Amino acid sequence: MKAPPPPSPVAKRARVSPFVFLLVLFLLLFSFLYGEDLKELLGSQAQARPSLHFNAAAAGDGIELPAATAATTEGRTTTRRWRGRLPFAANGDGEEEEEECDVFSGRWVRDEAARPLYREADCPYIPAQLACEAHGRPETAYQRWRWQPRGCALPAFDAAAMLDRLRGKRVMFVGDSLGRGQFTSLVCLLLAAVPDPAARSFATSPDQQRSVFTAAAYNATVEFYWAPFLLQSNADNAAVHRISDRMVRRGSIGHHGRHWEGADVIVFNTYLWWCTGLQFRILEDGPFDAGGNSSTTTWVSTEEAYAMAFREMLQWAREHMDFATTRVFFTSMSPTHGKSQDWGGGEPGGNCYGETEMIGDAAYWGSDSRRGVMRAIGEVLDGDGADVPVTFLNVTQLSLYRKDAHTSVYKKQWTPPTPEQLADPKTYADCVHWCLPGLQDTWNELLYTKLFYP
């Protein structure tokens, strides 16, 4: 039988109804507007986010600035999925389950009633470098913001409950001065459970390498250990470390790591000290201070050097931590606000000095925050570090908005400002560190959440 002839192109076109075009147009528009919601509904997101088992809450009353999204971070937004039981978890068996809420995506909400969580005058352990009120900051609006995740609420920070769950345990912060600030913030938050000075102690080693807060009734300690690169470096002196030609020794994680052994919860951080240029020097062999050819060094990209240190940190955790009983956290890079042109500031050469409001652009990303470092972390965690249950505290985006929260000029100045500097305060403003109480208390609310409600 002869096959019927194929339809002509004219016949084909005649069969296409105008409603088809309308349907296609509708589907494209629907996909554009609601594509992300569909992906969440169908569970097709490639990157897992954490689940929280406390009740969702409304955003609350007050000013809301701004709404951060995972898309603005270009890096890991949360902890990688871990199928084993997470120690210290208070929600069920502590295993990662279905996605419910990304606590790092949300907005800042003004909260006059409940903020700050403590007063500067009530925490005797705040160092002079972070005590902004004591050094003349005239307003405290920066203390009165609460982080509101999209779709849920952070659990209320309960100092007594935290210490009770950490009874007989050691919590250790390891890193640079930003890590020390987070450590100090947590100590201040915990004082609500140990108001009696006789029931607590705080000590710093003579070399300032280590500080330890002890809550005697709980037999619990919160500690800080200075290691700005995590690896052995030529900036390891906690008191004298203003070195421009910085370098780290390859394979040296154990140099500092021997002091971390036995900790039950470790919170690592390292970032700012790596930012000396596009390349970084690695000491392969020999002493740091050797001249001539007695030492062997190599230059690599800053991202490669950073990834090397991150891999060594993960390897140390594999060898020295029992993931059935201990937890590992990593606090993402803390942003700086040294260039007001980044956020459209009007004054040439301006910075965080005089800033009392946060940045309102949800997509804001400062020029000093290196996306390549965030990518390097993600690549290591998804590659060599896939077997290590490290919880990534992604505080970068929510902190990027907070140009108002830096210590600026309201801190102890170790070198008195010159008359020229006093005439132009922005020239000596600290746009790296954060006032306490303030932003870093939110970092610890997120730590509290991810420790007990992962």
Swiss-Prot record:
Intrachain disulfide bonds: C101-C152, C123-C188, C132-C435, C352-C431
Pfam family name, one: PC-Esterase
Name the record gives this protein: Probable xylan O-acetyltransferase 9
UniProt subcellular location: Golgi apparatus membrane
Motif (DXXH motif): 430-433
Catalytic residues as annotated in Swiss-Prot or TrEMBL: S177, D430, H433
GO cellular component, one term: Golgi apparatus
Domain of life assignment: Eukaryota
Predominant location category: Golgi
EC number: 2.3.1.-
Glycosylation, residue list: N219, N293, N394
InterPro entries per record: TBL, TBL_C, TBL_N
GO biological process: xylan acetylation
Family listed: Belongs to the PC-esterase family. TBL subfamily.
Record's bilayer topology term: Single-pass type II membrane protein
Biological role: Probable xylan acetyltransferase required for 2-O- and 3-O-monoacetylation of xylosyl residues in xylan. Possesses extremely low activity in vitro.
Position of sequence motif GDS motif: 175-177
Transmembrane feature ranges: 16-36
Residue ranges that the UniProt entry lists as topological domain Lumenal: 37-454
Keyword field: Disulfide bond, Glycoprotein, Golgi apparatus, Membrane, Signal-anchor, Transferase, Transmembrane, Transmembrane helix
Molecular function GO terms recorded: O-acetyltransferase activity; xylan O-acetyltransferase activity
Topology, Cytoplasmic side: 1-15
Name of the gene this protein is made from: XOAT9
PANTHER family, per the entry: PROTEIN TRICHOME BIREFRINGENCE-LIKE 9-RELATED, XYLAN O-ACETYLTRANSFERASE 9-RELATED
